[in-house]
Amino acid sequence: MLDRTTAPLIKDPIHFNFELPAINTYALSNGVPLYWLHAGVLDVVEINWIFEAGIWQEPLQGVANATAALLKNGTTTQTAKQINEQLELYGASLKIGASNDYASITLHCLVKHVPAILPTIASI
């Protein structure tokens, strides 16, 4: 049984060696900055697109969230069903949302499927 009338001894935190991976930068031909890092040995990737299009930039209340919600509802070249079927075919996950400061699109998939999925994301 623990004696809760006396405080436990204070111990030093466990020592560990923590190093962040190097962040690489690149500018695309259209001037958009690209940042990436190699974070491990798994063949999975997370790609984030960040846009200055959050709630603070919306002309009317609700526009940012409504726009984010509509992005997966089809494009001029693909229906919502086609987009979802392609993501499902490759086991990919796509999250689209808006916050106060920005809107974002996040893709999770296997590295080998990126070339097949990117055209769909570009059409969105």
Per-segment meaning from a language model:
Residues M1-Q86, T106-C109, P119:
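His/Glu-rich zincin catalytic helix
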Residues L2-R4, E88-I124:
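Acidic/histidine-enriched segments that form metal/cofactor-coordinating
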